[in-house]
Design a protein with these regions (language model features):
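Short beta-strand-centered segment that lines the nucleotide-binding/catalytic pocket of NTP-utilizing
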Residues: 118-129
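Catalytic cysteine-centered active loop of the rhodanese-like fold, especially the PTP/DSP P-loop
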Residues: 87-110
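Conserved helicase motor "Helicase C" RecA-like lobe of SF1/SF2 P-loop NTPases
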Residues: 107-116, 120
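Short hydrophobic segments within beta-strands
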Residues: 7-9, 94-96, 125
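C-terminal accessory "lid"/substrate-recognition subdomains
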Residues: 1-89, 128
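Short leucine-rich amphipathic alpha-helical surface patches
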Residues: 74-81, 95-99, 113
């Protein structure tokens, strides 16, 4: 079975998570080009799992376009991982504080993979919330 470890992280506070498997790496996606909801007072104490932040990112950003592209990349990788009997894939999403955009993106990818693949186990970790 393929285990996909998904992380959200902060470039500012702790950097890219280390892959603890023998593979030594994975995909890293930078969400900092998406408008930061944390710049608005009403979102400062919320995170990418909160409804208000989700609604904001759904309606006021290019997040879905970015995620659609990422889903295509990950689908291609997953197929190759299946063919080659690989057992671990690591995918990380970073933003400035690791609270809004990266959390949202990691949650969306986790949901996408869980709904699309019954033969994948996902492990989701938010390093800054």
């Amino acid at each position: 079975m393929l285990t996909v470890k998904i992380f959200s992280f902060s470039y500012l506070y702790n950097g890219i998570p280390k892959d603890e498997t023998p593979n030594g790496g994975g995909f890293v996606f930078d969400c900092r080009f998406i408008y930061n909801p944390g710049k608005k007072d009403e979102f400062k104490n919320l995170n990418g799992k909160d409804d208000a932040v989700i609604k904001f990112l759904d309606e006021n950003s290019d997040m879905q376009n970015m995620l659609d592209d990422i889903f295509d990349i990950i689908d291609s990788a997953v197929q190759v991982y299946f063919e080659r009997n690989f057992t671990n894939l690591m995918i990380s999403f970073g933003c400035t504080g690791g609270q809004h955009r990266s959390v949202y993106a990691a949650e969306k990818l986790n949901d996408y993979l869980a709904n699309k693949y019954s033969n994948i186990k996902t492990e989701l970790t938010h390093t800054n919330i």
